[in-house]
Amino acid sequence: MKIKVGILGASGYAGNELVRILLNHPKVEISYLGSSSSVGQNYQDLYPNTLLNLCFENKNLDELELDLLFLATPHEFSAKLLNENLLKKMKIIDLSADFRLKNPKDYELWYKFTHPNQELLQNAVYGLCELYKEEIKKASLVANPGCYTTCSILSLYPLFKEKIIDFSSVIIDAKSGVSGAGRSAKVENLFCEVNENIKAYNLALHRHTPEIEEHLSYAAKKKITLQFTPHLVSMQRGILISAYANLKEDLQEQDIRDIYTKYYQNNKFIRLLPPQSLPQTRWVKSSNFADINFSVDQRTKRVIVLGAIDNLIKGAAGQAVQNMNLMFDFDEDEGLKFFANL
């Protein structure tokens, strides 16, 4: 028997990837597409590549008969929309940032709004499947992690958990394709602005910073602060992070490989690459995999960690489906058994 799901925000890039994946999921039926601006429009007219013969509607969510609702909506939307009564009727996976951070003050600092639903904020489960699998299985509301966040945390988590690095030395240099900026028209994202170009943005201000710090702090069991700098790269999709940290001990690469293997050997979507094989965005394109590798610089006593994901799949829609699979006791990789399209 298939579960019935609905999607708010299916017109965006992440929403479209969600539709594409769910159409190929054997245990899901998409029965509702919500929109306030595209009511009556058939989804196939908006995205001819996606054969979903379903029109957008604008119904009261309390009227819907759904098992699960995905929210791929702008920040601050779901914080105002969701309530306990709705969560008694259906499960929710929120792809926005509205329930990712536990401290309400972080929303005032980083997102410039006062969170109106602090009780739900505390009850939401952070949907990084490789770290919080058991909590996700029991959750009614899952906060799907950010794209930079997913790549950064997964790449560094074992080092923080084992406390083998100087936490204050961590620097993350991240690069993302243009789809990470969303589908809305912006001058800075026009073809002539981004083609044959790479640029940094939001220095010391990127909103994924507190998210990364929060969950690496949980791993380290102490509050940490790190440096995160994102860049926009002239490609459609993909994230590559390069992270640097000072080692506290004289460790060899095999020592660190043993640590990563300890944490990730049983995870279906994390690929610890062989020595000397460095992650590339094309190897994870359109897939739910996170590729990770590292090198130890014996001269500087630093570990250099590389991670790559597809920002729209493992960084958004694919991870949301992975969360859904856990919440409904499906195989974790159901509907996600595809490799990179080189």
UniProtKB/Swiss-Prot annotation:
Its main location: cytoplasm. It catalyses: N-acetyl-L-glutamate 5-semialdehyde + phosphate + NADP(+) = N-acetyl-L-glutamyl 5-phosphate + NADPH + H(+). PROSITE patterns: ARGC. It holds the Pfam family Semialdhyde_dhC_1. It is an enzyme of class 1 (oxidoreductase). Gene3D superfamilies: Dihydrodipicolinate Reductase, domain 2, NAD(P)-binding Rossmann-like Domain. InterPro entries: AGPR_AS, AGPR_type-1, NAD(P)-bd_dom_sf, NAGSA_dehydrogenase, Semialdehyde_DH_NAD-bd. Its EC number is 1.2.1.38. Keywords: Amino-acid biosynthesis, Arginine biosynthesis, Cytoplasm, NADP, Oxidoreductase. It comes from the Bacteria. It is found in: Cytoplasm. Pathway: Amino-acid biosynthesis; L-arginine biosynthesis; N(2)-acetyl-L-ornithine from L-glutamate: step 3/4. GO terms for biological process: L-arginine biosynthetic process. Catalyzes the NADPH-dependent reduction of N-acetyl-5-glutamyl phosphate to yield N-acetyl-L-glutamate 5-semialdehyde. Belongs to the NAGSA dehydrogenase family. Type 1 subfamily. HAMAP family: ArgC_type1. This is N-acetyl-gamma-glutamyl-phosphate reductase. It comes from Campylobacter jejuni subsp. jejuni serotype O:23/36 (strain 81-176).
